[in-house]
Amino acid sequence: MRLLITLGPSGSTHGHSLHTDAGRRRGGRPFAQVVDELRAGQRVRTQGLKGAARGHVLARLHGALRAPLVCVAVDEEAADALAADLSFFLGGQGSLLAPRVLRLPADEVLPYDEVSPDAAAVTERLGALFHLGQGTRFPALVLSVRALHRKVLPLAVMRALAARVAVGQDFDRDSLARRLVRMGYQNSPLVEDVGTFSVRGDLLDVFSPLYDKPVRLEFFGDTIESIRAFDPQSQRTVDALKEVDLVPAREVLLTDETRPRAESAARAVADRINLPTIKLREQLDALREGLPGFGMEGLLPGFFEDGLSTVFDFLRDWSPEAPVIYLDDPLGQDRAADTLWEELERSHGAAEARQELICPPLEHFLSREDVNQRMQSFRVLEGGGLSLAQTERPPVHFSFGGTQDLREAILAHHGEEGALSPLVERLERWRELRVACVVACGTLSQADRLKRLLMDRNVMVKVHTEPLEDAVALYEPSIRAHLFTGEVSHGFVDGPGGLAVLADEEIFGARARRRPKRSKKLDAFGSGFGDLKEGDLIVHTDFGIGRYAGLTKMEVNGVPGDFLVLEYAGRDKIYLPVGRMRLIQKFSGGDPTQVQLDKLGTTSWEKTKKRVKEQLLKMAAELLQIAAARKAHPGHAFSAPDRYFAQFEADFEFEETPDQAKAIEDVLADMQKPEPMDRLVCGDVGYGKTEVAMRAAFKAALDRKQVAVLVPTTVLAQQHFLSFKKRFADYPVTVEVISGLKKAPEVREILKRAKEGKVDILIGTHKLLGGEVAFKELGLMIVDEEQRFGVKQKESLKKWRSQIDVLTLTATPIPRTLHMSMSGVRDMSIIATPPQDRRAIRTFVMKYEDTVVKEAIEREVARGGQVFFVHNRVESLPSIETQLRALVPQVSIGVAHGQMGEGQLEKVMLAFTEKKYQVLLCTSIIESGIDISSANTMIVNRADQFGLAQLYQLRGRVGRSKERAYAYLLVPSRRAVTKDAQRRLEVLQNFTELGAGFSIASHDLEIRGAGNLLGDKQSGAIAEIGFDMYAQLLEEAVAEMQGQPPKVQIEPDVTLPMPALIPDDYVSDVHQRLVFYKRFSQASHPDEVTDLRAELVDRYGEAPDEVDHLSELTLLKIDMRDLRLRGLEVGTTRLVVTLGADALLDGPKVAGLVQRSKGVYRLTPDMKLIARAPQGASGQDLISEAKKVLRDLSHCALPQA
């Protein structure tokens, strides 16, 4: 039987016959024709091949021809979309080592732009070239016109430098390290970033661009004994490997071979352009130092004997089966090539005028003629758009149906409970026509959400966790939709193929696209001891604030040990054994230059601690009082989220971060309780706090309750109004704002409607707290940046807190330690995970040039955007303003700085948010909460004078929309920047993923945040005693107010007759030694000690005896802390345990132990237990004896111990 039904766009009945015969379904005449013509070696033109249908057809083409595909798109954005479509139909993107769809990215900058290219793009390109050069088999390579024209590292160089290293292979470790330097890797004490390596003893760590994790090679002599992948954050092994491929880490390779060639190329260019000797010397110095500075890319072809290679050279050797080249939108590609060459000529001309040392464009890029000529030896398929090339036959027509009408039908019902009805009806119609429907969901959680929404409507769906392998074999009569994770550009209907594909964006609206990236958690373990430098302030629990003066070796009773030298007022010193590092913290929380050192032998430190503790007890009492009043006051218990709420959640255009999802869960759980909510949500700008507030507001509106949103400034009021309005546009929720911008009659009208219950969400400044504002049924108050309100406003907020649900938001990061200390008195949710890059901010480090500034501003303004120009000196702002007005006279410029009056500053900021200015020239004052999605370029002048954390905060002000954001970090010429600053600027360039340097810098921001949250008085206390001590005292105060017994903390003093330390020749980096000492001293469970020793072995090789002794000493201390014993002295003839008055021991039981021991134990009047050591015992025997003594004492412990 043959069933004939016709199906056109979106399921309408015309267009193609649809057969039940699976074989015919797979073919389809246009497809078969394309296959036949390509097999015959012809250039094939198609029409109607666009969107995700391209991926579908190309994937089938790969299967039919068994040939790899080289897919060329107009630009990088189009290449990303094409790669996503292909990945979806080719069974996923694969991994870095076994790719299925590989991207060969181009640089956004030209070699003459004085800007080093984006490091992530460089490493991704080198990885792709390696795979091509090695002949790795994979289905598809995707690149843009620019990447196809751009010349690349010579194939011979890639092959000569790349190294495959395997377990069991003989390889001289030092020669491998030298080879890595030649390949552009940088030696670093800790391997956290791509392109770095480190040598320690028998270990070599290296992070190759081919892997998403660094690897650790362990040598035995010259033989590689093991290869292990490790986590760059924890530095611990995660996987064992048999072999590893090492590829060049950068393109500007300054090696012994390339440097002389680069120098002679530089001299030749200098002679041709008559370059002054001083300028030539500066460039040659940079080359000799091996510093890849700005603009060195322009000379790159001169580094190699035969110049650079082309992508075609790599393609020729890639696959035994000649690849098929697919040109997407050939006419668009012609235009892109024209534009590229226009930009090249212009940029080259400008560089020549600046007398830069550069090679001509044809040495960097292929001409259009070259590309066309080289393409003639490949089979070519054209699709999408028009073509200018002549082909022997007319174009092959594909006529896929679209899904636009379905999108429009869903939009027409958006915000209503039945919004998904058009989708449900369409799925039913497709099922009747035996069409399998596939939905590409951006994430697994989005797939689960859509499944719930459809299952609620009795629609059977299936969520697939594996990538899509064969779309044609999917049809199942009972399943209406198959949900896969992945992205497609937009949907299509293939009637004859029995397949309909939808993007989740067509159901829920546009979502932010992301490219996968190497993950890096931002967390500074070891409480900042990894960067403790001589001269830094520390806080000792018993002696107060001192200065760290280094790590030194000393002998005590003939036993060597490591000691921290701590300096106090009057040059007094303490030598602290590393085993007692638990007693100190790095000082943070105030200006180090204003801090006074404590004086040893006085009571001043104890008095300060006592005073702060009294303050804290008062604060804790107040907080607990508010919490108690809240619990006593019955509030409104909101209903649980329903189907309609789930639809609102699904409309969120980003994937929730784990912290954000947890905050939403916390808030909704609080709202469902009968007592009023009082929750604080902390998170940096852009971390998604507003969405948490919007979910709470929607829940309140669904329960017919009104919401007040209180903000500190008119600017933020206006911003929140616009973002709430946009988010609730498709729902029956009324949002209004009252602020200084509204005329009095308008305000009166809004207030009247609020009183009548006709306004669901009212946003405003402190005016909302005034007597003239009344609500019919207020159920939720959202407070943004509470610390910026005055005392009076804070007092009225206290009154509200015990009556209705209050949700407070703050952009200031809050440290986890403070969060822990305050648990029980303040409900807090911390959003510490940054959102996955909407699109990574392109960060350029470059020399200040007027042309750079002019082009950056003009480029942003031309696409309708705005620019922040940050200059941190108020006194020179007017001269910068004059300079900018001369450079870009047609652009409107606003000026903002902290010395302006608040009203004036607010006016300028508001005008900028309303797009009345295109450029905002400002100091680093840019308001913390400000979110201007149209401002996507930031220029920072003298970036070398900013700290990492400050630059991170600034940079977070751009990149808040789907537009690509740019950050230009401008520095003076190379001569004015120190070598150290230059290396730091390289870190800044890889800024999309910050390493430990940022984690530590962020600590300071958190401390500032703690002060903001707790108020000025508490900031003063933090500055006086340091943050960690403050958090500890706060925890004690809260426990005391809650009636818990005070914790007695004892730090036992243990001496062993053998060295217990980490030898310098085992861990040579002093910072890493300090981190390990700190972690050993903090260990509170035997498992932690076992893990620490295992980590040392993993990272540094087999542990020497001294490390084993340190582990044993730490284990003894853990047992002693449990019993609150003060000291233990292990000698060759006896062991002495100092019990002390706080010991958790039962006196009679200890006396009984001594009596039963028959002279082995004796107790002295000053509470010391002396045990006789076995004759001739030493080393491990003595430690075993010490453990036995502590075990005996544990049998005498008081019941509560």
From Swiss-Prot:
Catalytic class of the enzyme: hydrolase
Q: Where is the Helicase ATP-binding domain?
A: 670-831
* Key words, A-Z: ATP-binding, Cytoplasm, DNA damage, DNA repair, DNA-binding, Helicase, Hydrolase, Nucleotide-binding
Q: Which SMART domains match?
A: CarD_TRCF (SM01058), DEXDc (SM00487), HELICc (SM00490), TRCF (SM00982)
Q: Where does the signal peptide begin and end?
A: none
PROSITE patterns hit by this protein: HELICASE_ATP_BIND_1, HELICASE_CTER
Q: Show the GO MF annotations.
A: ATP binding; damaged DNA binding; DNA helicase activity; hydrolase activity
Instruction: Give one GO biological process term.
Output: transcription-coupled nucleotide-excision repair, DNA damage recognition
- List the Pfam families hit by this protein, alphabetically: CarD_TRCF_RID, DEAD, Helicase_C, TRCF, UvrB_inter
Q: By what name is this protein known?
A: Transcription-repair-coupling factor
From what organism does this protein derive? Myxococcus xanthus
Give the lineage.
Bacteria, Pseudomonadati, Myxococcota, Myxococcia, Myxococcales
